[in-house]
Curated annotation (Swiss-Prot):
InterPro entries: Aldolase_TIM, Elp3/MiaA/NifB-like_rSAM, MoaA, MoaA_NifB_PqqE_Fe-S-bd_CS, MoaA_twitch, MoCo_biosynth_MoaA/MoaC, rSAM. It comes from the Bacteria. This is GTP 3',8-cyclase. HAMAP family: MoaA_B. The keyword Cytoplasm does not apply.
Amino acid sequence: MRNVQAQPLVSPTEPMIDPFGRAVTYLRVSVTDRCDFRCTYCMAEHMTFLPKKDLLTLEELDRLCSVFIEKGVRKLRLTGGEPLVRKNIMHLIGNLSRHLKSGALDELTLTTNGSQLARFAGELADCGVRRINVSLDTLNPEKFRTITRWGDLSRVLEGIDAAQKAGIHVKINAVALKDFNDAEIPELIRWAHGRSMDVTLIETMPMGEIEFDRTDQYLPLSQVRADLASQFTLADIPYRTGGPARYVTISETGGRLGFITPMTHNFCESCNRVRLTCTGMLYMCLGQNDDADLRKALRESESDEHLSQAIDEAISRKPKGHDFIIDREHNRPSVARHMSLTGG
């Protein structure tokens, strides 16, 4: 890696502003398209992964992230695929942590399936990672193996324990799936809140190849919330984490529950984020196909000025909203790329 010594404390940079007046302060970076699970709503079972030569190096990822931070990004989330299966990923995380120490970055975090957490939790905490999201749709070992196609639930639970013992706050992300985990959502909430973990429920999104009718899988969170309201006392709160979730508190558990509703309640009006893939493609919107090739700009010049200009041009094309829709007639997604490539 290039010289990444800690810099003195810096003043916050003015954020990038998109055509609709929204400040872009949040960068999600997919560091790999590979994963040790094959979740049915995320990727195909026999996935064809990108050749390693097409991936940005760790040094290039560091440089790109650093330019975004110089341009006003305050929150950086590493995703995948599964970010912790990327070789030498802790070198990248350790180097990016200098931006926390300098004050240029408010938060460095990641979304993980939890399979590698037992191994890396201590190092993550040492690098200044204070919060992580763990994707977990069920506490039933057989169902877990079905949805992930071969995942080991006990390994994930061990990873969550390790993260909490290391002082990392864990939030559980669960995709609500009709006739799969809808009946056990209350149990998942009680379990998580009993361990001081927030829960965020997510509507399934029409992305990537699908092996069965996506409409059969889709469960509107408005329905889930109504069902939960018959068991719990829900109260809306203004709590935000920088993402699109809207939160409530549950009186009976004392915990927080978030709802991410791309289908039933468009969250685009407050969108503050862009997504960078492991190949250097920048997506200004999760639900649009428009992209910008930052790898080309990165490799054309050692100067960051050309790269900065390419980022500015991309931000100028950030759309007002996504085009997510489930095509009920042809059983196909509105966005063809897999979530594992875009960054979950």
